Amino acid sequence: MLKQRILTALIALSVLAIVLFFVPPVVARAAVVVLILAGAWEWGGFLAGESNGARIAYTLFIGALVGALLVAQDNPLVVENVFRLALVWWLSALVWMLFFPTPIPRALTWVCGALVLVPAWAALDFLYRQTPDLLIFVLLIVWVADIGAFFVGKGFGRVKLAPQISPGKTWEGVLGGLTAVVLLAAAGSRYFDIDVAVLVPFCVAVAMLSV
């Protein structure tokens, strides 16, 4: 499983690097939109099972939201408000997980998908427009945290993190993932010339959301 995770991460990173650095920006940004729409298709499956009509409708719904945001993204307040909304959503989701499993109405599930997918696209597109290096670095935080948590958790995991939500995860794995991310942040601070005291807390926060 560990080898598979590392191999998947390396393949994904290689494909991503090709898309980000060797194709025109408009194509790279379009590829990110396609990725988000693929996520919308999968999310539609959670809502409607095997109903392709509902999945198509949900994919079009997310596509329309992304399109509207594309039109308005030159207004910095719009993008900032999307990120604020995403922050509120993820904090609310963390609270909701304390009461897991708790059923939610199907209509709210549609909204939850939009709150996951649309801000994700906005963040990926924003990072790419700053510099592709920064986008890859943020994705590396997630991948390194995942691989580090899996490796340490498999070898030393004893105390379960959240048995009802993800029985296989342990606190030892979390600490292993965060340690790996701190090392990545130290390297990133030199590459991007950012104070390590600033970058480490940022990377740890991102990793905490991912594990």
Regions from the PLM with identified roles:
Residues 2-206:
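Membrane-embedded alpha-helical bundles of polytopic integral membrane proteins
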Residues 210-211:
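Functionally important transmembrane alpha-helices
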